[in-house]
Swiss-Prot record:
This is Uracil phosphoribosyltransferase. Its cofactor is Mg(2+). It comes from the Bacteria. Disulfide bonds: none annotated. 5-phospho-alpha-D-ribose 1-diphosphate binds at residues 79, 104, 131-139, 200. It catalyses: UMP + diphosphate = 5-phospho-alpha-D-ribose 1-diphosphate + uracil. It holds the Pfam family UPRTase. Uracil binds at residues 194, 199-201. Binds 1 Mg(2+) ion per subunit. The magnesium is bound as Mg-PRPP. The gene is upp. GO terms for molecular function: GTP binding; magnesium ion binding; uracil phosphoribosyltransferase activity.
Amino acid sequence: MGVHELTHPLVRHKIGLMREADISTKKFRELAAELARLLAYEACGDFPLEVRTITGWDGNPVEIEQIKGKKVTVVPILRAGIGMLDGVLDMIPNAKVSVVGLARNEETLEAHTYLEKFVDKLDERLAVILDPMLATGGSMEATISMLKRNGCRQIRVLALVAAPEGLARVTAAHPDVDIYVAAIDRCLNEHGYILPGLGDAGDKIFGTK
């Protein structure tokens, strides 16, 4: 368990492109989806496999490996987490989708919940939470707590950028949760934004200001 920062050159390159001040909505979305795929690839690296026998192209039996009985629910935190959803579903197409809506109070920097919609049988599923920016950690801590209250015991987090302060908060509250992140940045500013960060990921994904 712990924090896993991806160091692959493709990840470093793509997260760097996302930091451009004048990046277009289209490009930001594309890069968010690409990085989500790479994060999902890394987060699924320990999935167990089983051998199955199928009929090959020539009519003869072929032994293949498939992921063994892993039930997954992907949990985007609204609204920015939606920008990572398609990329993760490209890699885990059979996953079911749960949704959590959280809004941050800009004065206290704490999150409050306005939507909670989980799939069934959470106690049998691995939940993969999506949030581009793990800043103060308040939204992530709250989402993990919600999942656990609803019976989920296997949880992983995918984030594009994280602040050390947010990582410290989440790992202290939930040391049993693995966090996969494309970049760990320097710090938070006085408004709770990550530096150097990406800016407001939700605005950049949805083209709003």
